[in-house]
């Protein structure tokens, strides 16, 4: 039922920034809707939300192009932060492994 509502909501996403579609007020529908947007963007669509709601930016519109660049910059920043965190966690884990191997080795002696 919620997926159907999310799908209906998804189908209303407009072209251009003039009348963006706000997020659904229902949390479950909102989650399903955002998953649909994510899947669509992964599969060749271009849907953005820079705060006022969702829309498909139009190439001939300067505002849309500016907001797309803003959106893509934020996505790149998020991706870099995730990569940095991932690397830090991996290094921390390997350090713990080294300490445990050293500690276990010295305890056995």
Model-based region annotation:
Residues 1-11:
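Short alpha-helical segments that sit at the start of domains
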Residues 28-42:
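Short amphipathic alpha-helical interaction segments
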Residues 85-109:
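Exposed, interaction-prone assembly regions rather than primary DNA-binding/catalytic cores
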